[in-house]
Structure formats: structure tokens, C-alpha cells
Regions:
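Domain-level signal for soluble alpha/beta catalytic cores
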Residues: 1-236, 240-366
Length: 366
């Protein structure tokens, strides 16, 4: 048979004009339209006033299957940072063998424990870091729904990762170190990525809060100049350990408040830095929690975060709190089967569980 399109150019143009009247600002043709249809449409709507609606800009990260919005007044969010071989000998050994089983497990555990975004870092000796980063992005995006944060000290690795990432990623990070700064900003623009602004320069750590503010303004101005927007930026509060600098927390708080109130910028910080070298770090971390990037593998921190959101009446926080406590109760409920009484709880069908969770590496073992 032959497909027939009966709409004439004149009829097509009339419909287009009605769309413009209703507020549509972009129109065109598809199957069945010819150059005559497009010319008639253009002639018809050219004299009409086009309504250009300015949609509010939003801080949004995406994966293949999930969108995460970062709102200045929204609930606390966690960036999971466990996928990093630094200090993890077992993970390093697996990566040298080309295995990503631990990476998949870490990704899944962090997502299940409340992480909204997952940081991915493959920086270690003895591997092809770029190829391992690409392999990891493929496996992690297959395993979990969370958007990813691409973390590398090498510009070419960040760009290669952004090129294949199926969504809008977060770059960790862009500082005022000239060699990287001049390359990474255009890369963020090219791939439409958000980025973490790290207030460091070639001179090293800023000596005080004012120097930190100046670095933030310098990077912000450069980003705006090339067409990026404030909503594309998350400022790292640059937390130092309070054991070495008694003013570390206050300086971080100052940076966060300045960025939010004066510059309308989102902020983040590495929670564990504040308590480095101190005993019973959990208490220091908990006190710092509301402005922190936490390790979502620690239930106590995540439970405190969800409870804090509820007390501050953040949108949807009551439901999140109830759901989380229900999940916690289910995890802690006494098991009745033989495996549980023996101290281990195995899935009824391990192979099915591996397939369901995309854990290809363990299927043969089962």
C-alpha cells in the first residue's frame, strides 16, 4: 500500500497558527510535510507574536531511569562516596583483576540506604583508569537508578566518562587550578553537566573564608561568561578537620551561608573530614550532618538526616521517615527460617536474586 497525507499546505499552516495562538513557541512538520507545507507555515506565523516563556531553571541530575532535583530549600541529599579504591585493598585487588562485583554491591547498598547520587572514582595504580571508569559507568548505571558524579583528577577521563554517560552527570570537581580550570569549564558546558566548585587554587588551600569566597566568585564569573548558569554549580564547603583547625566548622558554615544567601548557589561538603583524627567521630559528624555529604552506608547518619527533614517540615519528609523506619524494622525483625537461625539469611533462589539485581559476576558461583 501507499501512505497518503491529505492535509494541504494551507490547512497545515492554519493549524500551525492556532498552535501559536495557544502559546506554542516552536512548531514544525514531520511525516507528510513537504517544503511547500513548511513555507506556508512560515509565511502564516511570521507576522504573529511568538510567546517566549521563560521556564525557571532547575538543578537537575539524571540517569537513564531517574531524575534528581537539588532544591536550595529542599530535603537533605546524600552523595554516596564508597566507590573509590583509596584505602580499600580488597576493592583494589578486584579492580586489578578486572572485576566489578564489589563496585556493583557498593552501588546497590548505597542506593538502598538512601543515597540520591553516587560518586564514582577509579583513581589507583596498576589499572587503565580511563577504561575502568568507562566500564564502571556502564555497570553502575545498569545496576542502580541513581545519577552519577564523575570523580577523577584527569581531565581526559572526565570527558570520556561524560561522553558515554546516559544522562546528566555531576563533575567532581572544578577548582581554580589553572591547567584543569581552563579545560573543565568548557567540557561541563559541552556535555551539559553540573559541577562541584572546589574553592582551591594553584596556591593550595585558601587561608581564610574571604579568600575562599573570592575563589568561588572567580569560578562562578568564568562559568557564567561561557554560558553556564548558577543552577549548574554546587559549591564544596571545603571542610577541614576541627582537630587541626578549631574554626574549620565555622568557616565551612560561613561558606555555605554565603553561597546560598548571597549567590543562590547549592552547596555540599565531605562530612567525615570534620572529625578526622578524633575519637567517637560519629558524634561530631552527626552535629555537622545538616550541611554534609555523608557516607550512606552508616544507618545512624541517614536516620538522623531523615528525622531532621521531618522536624523541619520538608516536603514529603514525613512519608520518607515512616518508610525508612518501616524498612529498618523489617531488617531487624527476627528471622524464623533455618538459614536465619544459623546466622545467615540466604535468598530462596540465589541465581534468581543475582539475575534480578544484575549481579552477573556471582551467577556462576551460585
Amino acid at each position: 500500500g501507499v501512505t497518503v497525507y491529505k492535509t494541504t499546505p494551507e490547512e497545515f499552516a492554519e493549524v500551525g497558527a492556532k498552535l501559536i495562538e495557544e502559546g506554542v513557541s516552536i512548531i514544525g512538520g514531520c511525516c507528510g510535510t513537504t517544503p511547500a507545507h513548511i513555507k506556508a507555515l512560515a509565511d502564516k506565523v511570521k507576522p504573529m507574536g511568538i510567546h517566549h516563556a521563560e521556564a525557571p531553571r532547575r538543578r537537575v541530575l539524571t540517569s537513564e531511569r531517574k531524575t534528581v532535583e537539588i532544591d536550595l530549600d529542599g530535603p537533605f541529599m546524600v552523595i554516596g562516596e564508597r566507590i573509590n579504591p583509596t584505602g580499600k585493598k580488597k576493592l583494589q585487588a578486584e579492580l586489578r583483576e578486572g572485576s566489578l562485583n564489589m563496585v556493583r554491591d557498593m552501588a546497590r547498598a548505597q542506593e538502598e540506604n538512601g543515597a540520591a547520587i553516587l560518586d564514582v572514582n577509579m583513581g589507583m595504580n596498576g589499572i587503565d583508569e580511563k577504561q575502568m571508569m568507562l566500564n564502571t559507568i556502564h555497570e553502575v548505571t545498569y545496576t542502580v537508578d541513581c545519577p552519577l558524579c564523575i570523580d577523577s583528577s584527569h581531565v581526559d577521563i572526565i570527558e570520556a566518562a561524560l561522553r558515554i554517560y546516559p544522562g546528566r552527570a555531576l563533575i567532581n570537581s572544578i577548582s581554580l587550578e589553572k591547567e584543569k580550570f581552563e579545560k573543565l569549564l568548557p567540557i561541563a558546558k559541552k556535555y551539559g553537566a553540573m559541577f562541584i566548585l572546589l574553592p582551591l587554587s594553584d596556591e593550595g588551600l585558601p587561608k581564610d573564608a574571604e579568600e575562599k569566597r573570592q575563589i568561588v566568585r572567580t569560578i562562578l564569573d568564568a562559568a557564567l561568561k561561557i554560558g553556564l548558569h548558577k543552577e549548574d554549580i554546587i559549591v564544596d564547603g571545603l571542610v577541614a578537620t576541627v582537630g587541626a583547625n578549631p574554626l574549620a566548622a565555622l568557616e565551612c558554615f560561613d561558606t555555605i551561608q554565603y553561597c546560598k544567601d548571597e549567590l543562590s548557589l547549592a552547596t555540599a561538603c565531605g562530612l567525615s573530614n570534620i572529625s578526622f583524627g578524633l575519637p567517637e567521630r560519629i558524634y561530631v559528624n552527626s552535629a555537622f550532618l545538616t550541611i554534609a555529604i555523608a557516607n550512606p552506608s552508616q544507618d545512624l547518619l541517614m536516620n538522623a538526616a531523615v528525622a531532621s527533614d521531618m522536624l523541619l517540615h520538608k516536603e514529603g519528609s514525613d512519608i520518607r521517615y515512616i518508610n525508612r523506619m518501616n524498612q529498618r524494622a523489617q531488617k531487624e525483625a527476627p528471622a524464623t527460617d533455618n538459614a536465619a537461625s544459623a546466622g545467615t539469611l540466604e535468598p530462596a533462589n540465589p541465581v534468581f536474586d543475582c539475575v534480578l539485581k544484575g549481579n552477573k559476576g556471582n551467577i556462576l558461583k551460585e
